[in-house]
């Protein structure tokens, strides 16, 4: 899950009130965990998109440009590839758990992309799928089926709703689904029950991930007393990452006074012991 720590630090610096304050129903530690878990869900979906594209490529399909449109409006497709003379467009989501507003937005977005594709490809050459990877949650199947049928009727283009293995059966490679299930079962055994919020456990990699954040982010982070008192002790309980950042800022002092300012701020935090032990008030 690349850049997860970097994204979290940036969010804390920009929106500290989401993590601290009297009017939050959770303590900072719980909010950080919640943020990381939500981030994992999003990044898992992104990873599946990349993985599936690799599978399509290995199967010999021609991967096409995912960004389509012109002028000020561009649309990004989840999957699009060519097999023989057929163009496959797939709108891919992990699970069918959308509420009424999101499911309507999903269909609207799907139609908009089909409309854009029809300006590039012929109706008869297109096969368009709404695909939910997880077959265990089928919340809006009736709605999506009805809406896809309407799109098929109005645009005269092939549309299909698929869950889990169904997509791979559509492209005549069900063995890929079985391989994916086997991989996921092994992966689930390896991953921890909960993500670690002690970034000092992997200090070097954490430092490498966050060191190039904009200096304005670090400035916001280190100038906020509540963040320094309530958040940094949770993320950096042993000061390992903070010490690496301090060394890094000192090495860059010749590039601007802001780096001296940041170095002084970090040294102040370390010397006060605000990162010495987790504070989970």
Where does each model-flagged region fall?
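Secondary-structure boundary elements
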Residues: 58-62, 83-86, 119-126
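Active-site beta-strand-loop-beta-strand hairpin of nuclease catalytic cores
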Residues: 73, 80-90
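Interdomain/boundary linker segments immediately adjacent to catalytic/signaling cores
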Residues: 1-59
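Short secondary-structure capping micro-motifs at structural edges
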Residues: 39, 67, 75-78, 113-118
């Amino acid at each position: 899950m690349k850049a997860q720590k970097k994204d979290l630090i940036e969010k804390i610096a920009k929106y500290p009130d989401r993590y601290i304050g009297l009017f939050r129903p959770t303590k900072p530690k719980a909010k950080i965990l919640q943020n990381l878990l939500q981030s994992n869900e999003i990044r898992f979906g992104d990873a599946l998109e990349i993985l599936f594209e690799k599978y399509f490529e290995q199967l010999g399909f021609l991967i096409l440009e995912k960004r389509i449109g012109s002028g000020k409006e561009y649309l990004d497709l989840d999957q699009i590839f060519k097999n023989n003379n057929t163009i496959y467009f797939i709108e891919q989501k992990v699970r069918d758990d959308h509420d009424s507003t999101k499911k309507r937005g999903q269909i609207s977005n799907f139609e908009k992309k089909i409309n854009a594709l029809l300006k590039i490809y012929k109706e008869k050459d297109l096969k368009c799928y709404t695909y939910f990877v997880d077959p265990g949650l089928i919340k809006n199947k009736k709605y999506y089926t009805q809406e896809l049928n309407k799109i098929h009727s109005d645009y005269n283009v092939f549309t299909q709703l698929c869950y889990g293995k169904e997509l791979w059966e559509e492209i005549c490679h069900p063995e890929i689904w079985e391989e994916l299930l086997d991989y996921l079962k092994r992966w689930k055994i390896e991953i921890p029950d909960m993500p670690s919020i002690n970034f000092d456990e992997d200090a070097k990699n954490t430092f490498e991930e966050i060191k190039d954040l904009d200096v304005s982010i670090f400035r916001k982070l280190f100038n906020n007393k509540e963040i320094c008192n309530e958040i940094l002790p949770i993320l950096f309980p042993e000061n390992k990452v903070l010490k690496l950042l301090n060394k890094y800022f000192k090495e860059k002092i010749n590039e601007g006074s802001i780096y001296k300012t940041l170095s002084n701020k970090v040294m102040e935090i370390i010397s006060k012991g605000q990162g010495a032990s987790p504070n989970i008030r």
